[in-house]
């Protein structure tokens, strides 16, 4: 149930009946304050002048045509021409009942789309570090939300599995295998492995020459070199899968669509762009000049798609990637969770994609960029020694801190239960601290804040959920008994909680459209706060009679279900007790 969409359509029809153009925007928003109702329509300001009226005159005209019978108990004009809408308690009660009767909590299913989501994208032969965290968990929250809404989602893990460095890595792997026969390498070895390979490449000309030859052989499809390359990819992705599972993200090996996937397409794309007159030779390289992007001299910027030596660039791969996602995966929409520093690069690749007709304008290519993770000093998050923080080390520390926190509060908890709870709290805290911030901004990584039981944090939200569940344990009532009971809304706090519960679909819709999980976090935090106020002022177990008691239990029940489902769309685990 999307009340905002329902009201928007009703107000729009009334505006048209009052003389507004058919494309008018009613601008229905949640009211900022309770005294202004549940929703407010602000669209009169933009339209009134065109009709030769004041916004208030238009609002008065709109009210004569606005039929919200059975939806609103009161509609009034405020200020210069805002329309305040107060939802009818009977309408709220009816839709709370409907939400409780549905596994989806009354959330409708939009028209199904095929949506490709590009996220995580670690590099082969390197361990995942904190720089991969944001893309991985924000992208996964978007995927979970889109799937819940009923879309077909294709996860695309654009792994860095190709490039000239693989000659060097294969040469070093070969040397290691000869010297350490039978030893299986793990990724922890690969961190040092990469450094050692690079050191030899820089210092040993014979090794460097061999590495360069290996690149040529790998790129020509030689089976021995392909096998060595696959071994490096397998070692990396096996280790990365452990991290994905610890993070409770939904990526698997089946979702890997590395850079190498697009290699066979690159020569054809360069030839096609030349044939279309979009790409030209410039100083030996193949270049596309884009009028939309200017260099320092104010001339169209040249984007190289093939180097003088015949090698291809990331841009060429990204052009092929977009083409593949439309033509082969049949995407209706493509979302890229890549940091903001890549924005111009992506815009240039997509400008070429559009000019070449590889992806029509009707299929959105969206860069859902994000800022950086910073330390308390406001600088990029590093180890004390100034190095890159490995993601596995960060998760180990989260678990250790959560273990201490949980043990302090529950000294008698059995060890296995403590470990399970510490994992939910620790991993949840790291993820929620990131997801609760607007992805477009940088954010400060702070252990004390993220593990606090106050404020908009995972531990607070997990505790809020267990608090609602505890009401049911005390009530000793089964779900069948409760299902038959009516919902009655008489108190203001009951109405405020019910109205917020029924805004779950609106919140999901915003997250799906904008790729902004922080909107869901803000909604759930607000919901938990409203439940707190309701619980304090509207006695549940000691209500004046059974009818009121059961009605309030149903509001508590929908609160618990909404918190659990909302946190699940974020990939945050809930627990029964804390």
From Swiss-Prot:
Query: What Pfam families does this protein map onto?
Result: Arg_tRNA_synt_N, DALR_1, tRNA-synt_1d
Supply the enzyme class, top level: ligase
**GO cellular component assignments:** cytoplasm
Show the SUPFAM superfamilies listed in the entry.
Anticodon-binding domain of a subclass of class I aminoacyl-tRNA synthetases (SSF47323), Arginyl-tRNA synthetase (ArgRS), N-terminal 'additional' domain (SSF55190), Nucleotidylyl transferase (SSF52374)
- What keywords were assigned to this record? Aminoacyl-tRNA synthetase, ATP-binding, Cytoplasm, Ligase, Nucleotide-binding, Protein biosynthesis
- Catalytic function, reaction form: tRNA(Arg) + L-arginine + ATP = L-arginyl-tRNA(Arg) + AMP + diphosphate
Q: Where in the cell is it found?
A: Cytoplasm
**For this protein, what is any one GO molecular function term?**
arginine-tRNA ligase activity
The record's InterPro entries line, in alphabetical order, gives: aa-tRNA-synth_I_CS (IPR001412), Arg-tRNA-ligase (IPR001278), Arg-tRNA-synth_N (IPR005148), Arg-tRNA-synth_N_sf (IPR036695), ArgRS_core (IPR035684), DALR_anticod-bd (IPR008909), Rossmann-like_a/b/a_fold (IPR014729), tRNAsynth_Ia_anticodon-bd (IPR009080)
What's one GO BP annotation on this UniProt entry? arginyl-tRNA aminoacylation
The EC number of this protein is 6.1.1.19
User: From the record, which residues define motif 'HIGH' region?
Assistant: 122-132
Q: How does it assemble?
A: Monomer.
- Protein family per UniProt: Belongs to the class-I aminoacyl-tRNA synthetase family.
Task: Spell out the protein name for this chain.
Answer: Arginine--tRNA ligase
Organism whose genome encodes this protein = Shigella sonnei (strain Ss046)
Q: Gene behind this chain?
A: argS
């Amino acid at each position: 149930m999307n009340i905002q969409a329902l009201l928007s359509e009703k107000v729009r029809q009334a505006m048209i009946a009052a003389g507004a153009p058919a494309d008018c925007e009613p601008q229905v928003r949640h009211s900022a304050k309770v005294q202004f109702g549940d929703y407010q329509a602000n669209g009169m300001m933009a339209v009134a002048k065109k009709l030769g009226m004041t916004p208030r005159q238009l609002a008065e005209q709109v009210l004569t045509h606005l039929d919200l019978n059975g939806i609103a108990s009161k509609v009034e004009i405020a200020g210069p021409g805002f329309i305040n809408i107060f939802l009818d308690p009977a309408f709220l009660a009816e839709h709370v009942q409907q939400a409780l009767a549905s596994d989806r909590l009354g959330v409708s299913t939009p028209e199904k789309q095929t949506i490709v989501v590009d996220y995580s994208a670690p590099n082969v032969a390197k361990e995942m570090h904190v720089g991969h965290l944001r893309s991985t968990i924000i992208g996964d929250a978007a995927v979970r939300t889109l799937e819940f809404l009923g879309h077909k989602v294709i996860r695309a893990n654009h792994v860095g599995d190709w490039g000239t460095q693989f000659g060097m890595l294969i040469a070093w792997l070969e040397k290691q295998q000869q010297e350490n026969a039978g030893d299986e390498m793990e990724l922890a070895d690969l961190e040092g492995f990469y450094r050692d390979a690079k050191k030899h490449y820089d210092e040993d000309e014979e090794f460097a020459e061999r590495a360069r030859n290996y690149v040529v052989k790998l790129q020509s499809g030689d089976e021995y070199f392909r096998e060595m390359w696959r071994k490096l990819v397998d070692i990396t992705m096996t280790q990365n899968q452990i991290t994905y599972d610890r993070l409770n993200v939904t990526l698997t090996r089946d979702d890997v669509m590395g850079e190498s996937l697009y290699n066979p397409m690159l020569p054809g794309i360069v030839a096609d762009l030349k044939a279309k007159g979009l790409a030209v030779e410039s100083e030996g390289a193949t270049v596309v000049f884009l009028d939309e992007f200017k260099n320092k001299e104010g001339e169209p910027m040249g984007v190289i798609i093939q180097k003088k030596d015949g090698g291809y660039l990331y841009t060429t791969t990204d052009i092929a990637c977009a083409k593949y996602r439309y033509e082969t995966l049949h995407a209706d929409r493509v979302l890229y969770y890549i940091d903001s520093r890549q924005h111009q690069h992506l815009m240039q690749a997509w400008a070429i994609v559009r000019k070449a007709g590889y992806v029509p304008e009707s299929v959105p290519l969206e860069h859902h960029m994000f800022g950086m993770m910073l330390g308390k000093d406001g600088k990029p998050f590093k180890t004390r020694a100034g190095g890159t923080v490995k993601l596995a080390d960060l998760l180990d520390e989260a678990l250790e801190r959560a273990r201490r926190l949980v043990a302090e509060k529950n000294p008698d908890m059995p060890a296995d239960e403590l470990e399970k709870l510490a994992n939910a709290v620790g991993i949840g805290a790291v993820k929620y601290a990131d997801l609760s911030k607007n992805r477009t901004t940088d954010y400060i990584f702070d252990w004390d804040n993220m593990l606090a039981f106050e404020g908009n944090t995972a531990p607070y939200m997990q505790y809020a959920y267990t608090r609602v569940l505890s009401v049911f344990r005390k009530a000793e009532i089964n779900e069948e008994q409760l299902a038959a009971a009516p919902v009655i809304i008489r108190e203001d706090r009951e109405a405020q909680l019910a109205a917020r519960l029924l805004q779950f679909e609106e919140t999901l819709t915003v997250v799906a459209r904008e790729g902004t999980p922080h909107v869901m976090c803000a909604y759930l935090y607000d919901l938990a706060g409203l439940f707190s106020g309701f619980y304090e002022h509207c006695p549940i177990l000691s209500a004046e009679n059974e009818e009121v008691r059961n009605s309030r239990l149903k509001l508590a029940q929908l609160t618990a279900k909404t918190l659990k489902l909302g946190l699940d769309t974020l990939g945050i685990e809930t627990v029964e007790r804390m």
